[in-house]
Amino acid sequence: MKVLVLGGVAAGTKVAAKLMREDRSNEVIVLNKGENISYAGCGLPYYVGHVIEEKEQLIVNTPEKYEKLTGVKVHTGTEAIAVKPEEKTVVAKDVNTGEETIYTYDKLVIAVGESPAKPPIEGVDLENVFFVRTPEDAIRIRNLVDTGNVKKAVVVGAGYIGLEIAENLKSQGIRPFVLDMVPQILAPGFDKEMADYVEGKLVEAGIPVVTGVQVTGIEGDGKVEKVLTSKKAYKADMVVMSAGIRPNTAFLADTGIEMFKGTILTDTFGQTNIPDIYAAGDCAMVHNAITGKAAWSPMGSTANIAGRLIAQNIRGKGLEYRGVLGTAVCKLPGVNVGRTGLTEVQAKEEGFQPVSVITVVDDKAHYYAGASTFIIKMIADKESLRLLGVQVIGSGAVDKIVDIAVTGITMKATLTDLADMDLAYAPPFSTAIHPFEHTLNVLMNKIQGNFETFTPAEYAAGEAEGYRVVDGCLKPSIEGAPYVELTEVDGPVDGLDPEEKLLLVCNKGKRAYLLQNRLKFYGYKHTKVLEAGITFNDVEVE
């Protein structure tokens, strides 16, 4: 069987290698526009920041090494320019000479990836304006950074790559400004209150962020000097554009392959609407594992999973892709973030009845060296108790919380299914009740009516108006609020009316919950706890 693979980075090389492992009698050819294949695109920001020192470390396999390792034939510098499904041929050209060659196939896999979206603004082609996609891009950025001539940089785009670039520029003594046109960072993967908390941490670390701003132009005499926006101008010695990507699928316009906004539609087997043509990676749609709807997941993990599955399906195994959850983790200055599943906003849009909770919980035994906290937002459907999503912020291993959630959501588990799991515990690693389980317990308490709260989003929206703030911290911490020492509450509290609306606030939320439990026992009927306490919320008493 002759299999032609268009694209040789993540999905393409995975398909090709797996095909040859399945059956070495296959003839598998990879056509790749660039000279590098199988490079670490997700590692590019860390090369800029000297976390990865040698550029060779970014190249997982050279074409020569890959060919010897797999038996796949690799043609670099070869760009596919036309596909003719009725003839089962692909026309490709040599990017250096322009010479065209016709390739035949029995099966075709399209894995041509994406390119940065180039905004239609003045000055985008000035010197020292960069995009980040290939090792060559990262090398050019680092070469400029290493001259010591860059003092200020503007990063356009507050997604994962943009923020990782900003962190690594900051580590090299550069002051980065991050701009984004949407109202929050890390959109749409995080609910706004979680994103805003992370933004505050970035600002504390010396990375100013401006959201809701449109970049309108770039000025400079030959090279960038200033970035113009809808609000103000920013001086800059460098600009890194990270404000979106577009699939490299223009050459497929007349093929009959179904697409959505340039992204190839596939079924659960990785097939397009045309027989014997498959698609994977950043140029292809997959589906959301919760909603079943088409989803775009331009992630290296998705590309590799889909590529491996397609290789097996070409061999006739009939394996269906479970779908994606938008799972992601990101390292930022002093804080890591992770997420999977639906946000609360997305869950509402999809017709669920979402209920959520935000906890601040120890990430390991509090007495163990290096112990810190996780801030975990857990979202479930109130009626079915099905787990829908998790978002995590913390200085430690946020990925382990995310990965537990991924497992549960993928299996369509309910909170009851996931309760009381025998998760790993030892003081250096976790807490006796795992942070995931702790948050699940709190959410179940809330659903069952044992924990009445305002979420941070509800509090910020003014829903606690009319409630009197009560300081339930370990020691007085909220100016202007009456202080109540939890351990001394053994009856009605002087100065607090049992009929009064009381908002109980502590450092993290747990102590306020315990206070609520006692006050309820002594006849207080209208108490609410502010989830995540003053660790997460700005609480002021008028």
Task: For every predicted segment, state its role.
Residues 420-423, 427, 431, 438-456, ...:
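Rhodanese-like catalytic fold shared by cysteine-dependent sulfurtransferases
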Residues 5, 28, 109, 240, ...:
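Hydrophobic beta-strand scaffold positions of dinucleotide-using enzymes
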Residues 1, 7-8, 283-396, 427-431, ...:
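Mid-to-C-terminal Rossmann-like scaffold of FAD/NAD(P)H-dependent oxidoreductases
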Residues 125-149, 222-226, 233-309, 405-408, ...:
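FAD-site-proximal beta/loop scaffold in flavoenzymes
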Residues 110-172, 208, 261, 266-268, ...:
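Glycine-rich dinucleotide-binding loop and its adjacent helix/turn
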